[in-house]
Amino acid sequence: MALSTSSIGKKFIQGISGAFLIVFLLLHATINFFSVIDSFTGKYGAVAVDDKLFSMGDGLFKLGCDFMSTPFISIMVPILALGFLVHIFYGGWLSWRNMKARGGFKRYEVASKAAADSWSAKNMLILGIVILGFICFHLTHFWAKMQLPEMFGIGTYEDNPYVLLNAVFAKWWVLVLYVVWFGALFLHLTHGFWSMFQTVGWSGQIWMKRLKVIGVIVAAIICLAFVAVAVNAFLQANALI
């Protein structure tokens, strides 16, 4: 009970839920990046228009999507949803508490002047709201077309992920919105990565500098992979490659 009611406990839960979501993002980015690899092998365009090739399971991205349909992942979906809800709830609560304590719209509590000077550290709440809004936008494009019909029989099911990628990213303005979202995600992750280690007590000056660098690298890998997927799908959908 103390873990969920005390200030330190809430920060700990926020950090752990954040770590869980980072692992998910790494897996999600990796599987989606398979579609970019398929472009270089010539399988993306072929599988996107040939149902026979698609049914044969050709393409790394198709294999990755098949993995995401396994019973293990089906069990993990509600756990993932819970992780998001916990992270959103405690993130909002901590931000509200900080604003109330400081008497104004003050952002995340940070441990040092250097951290306080970071734009992302000061604007974690705003970044979180932007990311949450785009998650809802993103779910209408993919989850609502694949998992939702499969799990609940709602909507039209699209079983070819290549076709779905093309349909979503064919419009340039959708691509731009997603790139903006990935930028917000990058800023959120660069601060969130090292702060989750600080939350669990790993806050030595030497290691904190290293963790900030590692955080930038991890955030860059995740977000650049997503950007590559979106740009590649736009180029494929418009027959530019």
Question: Positions of the model-derived regions?
Answer:
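Membrane-embedded alpha-helical bundles that constitute the cytochrome b-like, heme-associated redox core
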Residues: 1-241
